Regions:
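Double-stranded beta-helix
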Residues: 5, 10-13, 73-79
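Conserved short histidine dyad/triad with adjacent acidic residue
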Residues: 7-26, 59-61
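Short histidine-centered beta-strand/loop micro-motifs
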Residues: 21-25, 42, 48-49, 67
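Short hydrophobic/aromatic-rich beta-strand segments that constitute the beta-sheet cores
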Residues: 23, 40, 74-77
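Short, conserved beta-strand element in jelly-roll/cupin
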Residues: 25-40
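Short acidic-glycine-tyrosine-enriched beta hairpin
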Residues: 44-61
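Ligand-binding loop in jelly-roll beta-barrel domains
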Residues: 60-79
Length: 79
């Protein structure tokens, strides 16, 4: 799927430095990673590495831990 077709480049941008924090998704989020490297570990699940140019979706209700290995910038969209 082409990124411009789903409007990725019109989505807001979020940035975060190297860090580790818990997160819970109250609603579905789709994001496109512009820069950085992240390991997202769902509570009770296996870690998933997310890197530059990955398009990922997180379901509503997901509880996880974000471990940002290198500063991240991403486009994101809720719903």
């Amino acid at each position: 799927m082409k990124l411009d077709v789903i409007g990725v480049y019109d989505w807001p941008i979020w940035s975060k430095e190297v860090s580790r924090f818990p997160w819970k998704y109250d609603q579905k989020e789709t994001c496109y990673i512009l820069e950085g490297e992240v390991i997202v570990t769902p509570d009770g699940g296996e870690p998933v590495k997310i890197v530059e140019n990955d398009l990922v979706s997180f379901p509503a209700g997901l509880s996880c831990t974000w471990e940002i290995l290198s500063p991240v910038r991403k486009h994101y969209n809720f719903g």
